[in-house]
Amino acid sequence: MATPKSSSANRKKGGKKSHRKPKRTWNVYINRSLKSINNHMSMSGRTMKIVNSFVNDLFERIACEAATVVRVNKKRTLGARELQTAVRLVLPADLAKHAMAEGTKAVSHASS
């Protein structure tokens, strides 16, 4: 008969318990956007997971492309210009144009 593992088996060196990193989700922001469009609409949990996965994938693609742009230009810092270039490369033409306009508006709103 197998014995259950003790809690000390799950501890790292030094006697501390390992903690899981909390998963980062965009659920709050997705709900805010949905409510700003139509206050009476809601999303099911499954739909929220799908939209969250879509946003995470897009974020990952833009971040990877921005890192590549920085590396190609032999720079050390990621600026607004590199992000704009990454968005233009990742998104289709019309969608990229709208994303650029909204991003510029958000940055100017946050800085003022």
UniProtKB/Swiss-Prot annotation:
One of its GO terms (cellular component) is nucleus. Its main location: nucleus. Gene3D superfamilies: Histone, subunit A. Residues 1-24 are annotated as: Disordered. Core component of nucleosome. Nucleosomes wrap and compact DNA into chromatin, limiting DNA accessibility to the cellular machineries which require DNA as a template. Histones thereby play a central role in transcription regulation, DNA repair, DNA replication and chromosomal stability. DNA accessibility is regulated via a complex set of post-translational modifications of histones, also called histone code, and nucleosome remodeling. The nucleosome is a histone octamer containing two molecules each of H2A, H2B, H3 and H4 assembled in one H3-H4 heterotetramer and two H2A-H2B heterodimers. The octamer wraps approximately 147 bp of DNA. This is Histone H2B. It comes from Trypanosoma cruzi.
